[in-house]
Amino acid sequence: MTEKHIVIEDIDPVMLYGVGNGHLQIIKSLYPKLRVTARGNVIRVLGDSEEMQRFERCIEQIRQHVLKYNAITEEDLIDIVNGRQTKADAVKGVVVYSISGRPIKSRSENQQRLIDAYEQNDMVFAVGPAGTGKTYLSIALAVKALKEKTAKKIILSRPAVEAGEKLGFLPGDMKDKIDPYLQPLYDALEDMLPQVKLQDMMEKHIIQIAPLAFMRGRTLSDAVVILDEAQNTTPQQLRMFLTRMGWNTKMIITGDMTQIDLPNPQKSGLVEALRILDGIEGIGVVELTKKDIVRHKLVTRIVQAYEADEKQ
């Protein structure tokens, strides 16, 4: 008789076991030659060695499903243990799944171009108005890379000075000062990763969120690096950021040319970079438009109204 301990890593074991160990009971019923007990993140298995190997493969398939989709239904569980394709796997074009199980994927032609550009290039510029999903989709691509282990970390950054505000004149310590600028990045991550796992990854610096000034002097390797609100960088700041790129790293730079908050809009680093880097191999540029807006339908009308007013 063989005994083995299977350690459940990278996911909350409760998601695998099910409420009241309901999922585990279904799995155990299919392996009558085994005695299975679970405690914490360890499953203790005792019994026939061949059946144990099949059981271990089944547990790994379920773990991979939970890791990918952040959830597993009883129907999915039964499909997996019976060797069938799950409904979730049948959905095409999904980047990752939210913590509620909602598929995050392209919702417009230009969003799909962003995904394609990311897969084909090491550096991508995604430019478009608010609400086009450029930041959210970029973070989803980064989370996917982390889950698939094609990247070891995610680094997210924004310029910390916008709308004429300067950090030195804001109240509180440094974290209090920069967090409001970085909140949109936290919001996207919280939609895609369970809170406990996200907190653990941030404490281990697997996920790093920092203002642009903190990038100086670093070489960013084995990572997906995203710079948001790049239209509010100076040419010197953006050049500094772009040259941080290390081995096995992908960069996504997002920005909205209609929301430049610099004192001199002509001095936007994003405007200059798009001009200077045009046509360089390995750099993709994707332009999103108001047709790609995926927020409330009023957002599209608001953007159109402001554009019409600016033309008068």
Descriptions of predicted regions:
Residues 29, 36-91:
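Interdomain "pre-motor" coupling segment immediately N-terminal to P-loop NTPase/helicase cores
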Residues 32-36, 285-286:
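A short linear hydrophobic-aromatic micro-motif
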Residues 11-31:
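Short amphipathic alpha-helix segments
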Residues 97-109, 113-227, 231-312:
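Conserved helicase motor core of SF1/SF2 NTP-dependent helicases
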Residues 1-14:
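N-terminal presequence-like segments and adjacent domain-start helices
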Residues 11, 21, 49-50, 232, ...:
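Short, surface-exposed acidic/glycine-rich loop or hinge patches that mediate macromolecular interfaces
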Residues 31-32, 193:
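A broad structural signal for alpha-helix termini and local helix breaks/kinks
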Residues 23, 55-58, 238:
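Hydrophobic side chains in well-ordered alpha-helices
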